[in-house]
């Protein structure tokens, strides 16, 4: 069982803040902590300084009169050898660190002779590009309160209210505020069309909203007995996961939407993800179990509905991510008692690799452009870690959050990642870079599955 709700009150709550406004932090002091007008004594050569102020001037006057090209070259070489080629007597900053020799000189020389072109290493910013306030975000490991739609609009649930932030314009709007007896909001997920959004509630209901008209289309109820903490779309099928351990497939086109119910988890379902093909569903629960469900074999009437039951994790599994470049490859992350990222072949059910990250794994995202995986973590560093796949070498660690990074979402072009944490901030990171083929995401037309939903309540 993993740590769920964090009741520790944040110091940010001492004053009211507007949601999704720029968050300004006090400027951090310089690491060197030097005054611009006071020399740094530890970086100065006092012997040379004394020589330059006394005898150095005399030497220059004498050599100027009898200067020759050969003597001048000798003087420069001698200055370099004796480390006397200074331009300043007073040092106002530390010397830059010498570059590390990664290869012996003979190897590096041979490499320079080869005409083979080497791809330059991508620059990964270590700080967030933008930080927005997210007051009253629920600090609960088992919920899913952030999603970025295909129309480039980010949805975030803050307590009882769902806000929409348009990444193209930077504008913010309120979609809905849930009644006190029904809330707070416990999950949110965009439909593939980027216009319709599902909102899971604490009272076991799920609401469907049209973001273009700010209108509620229908309410799904009766399937779950407790809060709905996870949602996942598969075309016209909305899959919901509840604290009751049930997973329900809802066909939003029909009046009685429940078409399948999966039973396998004994505790809350906190993670749901459909594969890119829409054929397999991965679910993670507070029972430390990952299930792989296949629509072609799963049936509500069968005793064993799942394709695979994966029990190697030792803590709650919320973080799930299907690989975009390799079929049947799933990454899963375990909670504070597990701390591992595991990779699975969902065709055979075999565990391909397991990596100890050292801290609670809250969320996982694959890069759409490179063979890279991003993970978000809790105590002690509350960092985002970028991994190279399949070597799982750390490429970067991004810090800035002061509480566990519970939620992550990826922009439609795959370049930017948004992260939300219990510190009540929403941060944006240019972690995956800008591919040459990246194009601005255009809003998609409303898909056919919702053509009849307006008439169903």
Curated annotation (Swiss-Prot):
Keywords: Cell cycle, Cell division, Mitosis, Nucleus, Repeat, Ubl conjugation pathway, WD repeat. Its main location: nucleus. One of its GO terms (biological process) is cell division. Pfam families: WD40_CDC20-Fz. Disruption phenotype: Delay in plant development due to reduced cell number and male sterility. GO terms for cellular component: mitotic checkpoint complex; nucleus. This is Cell division cycle 20.1, cofactor of APC complex. It is found in: Nucleus. WD repeats lie at residues 138-175, 180-219, 223-260, 264-303, 312-354, 356-397, 400-439. The keyword Nucleotide-binding does not apply. Pathway: Protein modification; protein ubiquitination. It comes from Arabidopsis thaliana (Mouse-ear cress). Component of the anaphase promoting complex/cyclosome (APC/C), a cell cycle-regulated E3 ubiquitin-protein ligase complex that controls progression through mitosis and the G1 phase of the cell cycle. The APC/C is composed of at least 11 subunits that stay tightly associated throughout the cell cycle. Interacts with APC10, FZR1, FZR2, FZR3. Binds to GIG1 and PYM. Part of the mitotic checkpoint complex (MCC); interacts with MAD2, BUB3.1, BUBR1 and BUB1. Binds to cyclins CYCA1-2, CYCB2-1 and CYCB2-2. Interacts with PANS1. Belongs to the WD repeat CDC20/Fizzy family. One of its GO terms (molecular function) is kinase binding. InterPro entries: Cdc20/Fizzy, WD40/YVTN_repeat-like_dom_sf, WD40_CDC20-Fz, WD40_repeat_CS, WD40_repeat_dom_sf, WD40_rpt. Expressed in meristems and organ primordia. Present in flowers, leaves, stems, roots, pollen grains and developing seeds.
């Amino acid at each position: 069982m993993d740590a769920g709700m964090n009741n520790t009150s944040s110091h940010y709550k001492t004053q009211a803040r507007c949601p999704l406004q720029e968050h300004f932090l006090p400027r951090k002091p310089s690491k060197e902590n030097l005054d611009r007008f006071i020399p740094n004594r530890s970086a100065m050569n006092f012997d040379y300084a004394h020589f330059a102020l006394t005898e150095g001037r005399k030497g220059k006057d004498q050599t100027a009169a009898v200067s020759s090209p050969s003597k001048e070259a000798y003087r420069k070489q001698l200055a370099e050898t004796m480390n006397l080629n200074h331009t300043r007597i007073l040092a106002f900053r530390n010397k830059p660190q010498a570059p590390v020799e990664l290869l012996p000189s003979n190897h590096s020389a041979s490499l320079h002779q080869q005409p083979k072109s080497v791809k330059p290493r991508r620059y990964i910013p270590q700080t967030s590009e933008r930080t927005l306030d997210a007051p009253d975000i629920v600090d609960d490991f088992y919920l899913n309160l952030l999603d970025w739609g295909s129309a480039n609009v980010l949805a975030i649930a803050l307590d009882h209210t769902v806000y929409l932030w348009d990444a193209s314009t930077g504008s913010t709007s309120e979609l809905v505020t849930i009644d006190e007896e029904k809330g707070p909001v416990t999950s949110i997920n965009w439909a593939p069309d980027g216009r319709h959004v599902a909102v899971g509630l604490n009272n076991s209901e799920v609401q469907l909203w049209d973001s273009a008209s700010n209108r509620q289309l229908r309410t799904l109820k009766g399937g779950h007995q407790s809060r709905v903490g996870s949602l996942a779309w598969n075309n016209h099928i909305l899959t919901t996961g509840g604290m009751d351990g049930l997973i329900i497939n809802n066909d939003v086109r029909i009046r009685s939407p429940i078409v399948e119910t999966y039973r396998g988890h004994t505790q809350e379902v906190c993670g749901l993800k459909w594969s890119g093909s829409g054929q397999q569903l991965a679910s993670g629960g507070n029972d430390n179990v990952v299930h792989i469900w296949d629509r072609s074999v799963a049936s509500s009437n069968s005793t064993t509905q799942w394709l695979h039951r994966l029990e190697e994790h030792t803590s709650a599994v919320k973080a799930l991510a299907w690989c975009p470049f390799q079929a049947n490859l799933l990454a899963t992350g375990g909670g504070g008692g597990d701390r591992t990222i595991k990779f699975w072949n969902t065709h055979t059910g075999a565990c391909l690799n397991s990596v100890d990250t050292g801290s609670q794994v809250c969320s996982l995202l694959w890069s759409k452009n490179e063979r890279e995986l991003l993970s978000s973590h809790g105590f002690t560093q509350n960092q985002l870690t970028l991994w190279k796949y399949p070597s799982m070498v750390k490429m970067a660690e991004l810090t800035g959050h002061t509480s566990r990074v519970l939620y992550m979402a990826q922009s439609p072009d795959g370049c930017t990642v948004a992260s939300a944490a219990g510190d009540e901030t929403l941060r944006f990171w240019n972690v995956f870079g800008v591919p040459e083929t990246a194009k601005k995401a255009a809003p998609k037309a409303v898909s056919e599955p919702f053509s009849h939903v307006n008439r169903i309540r």
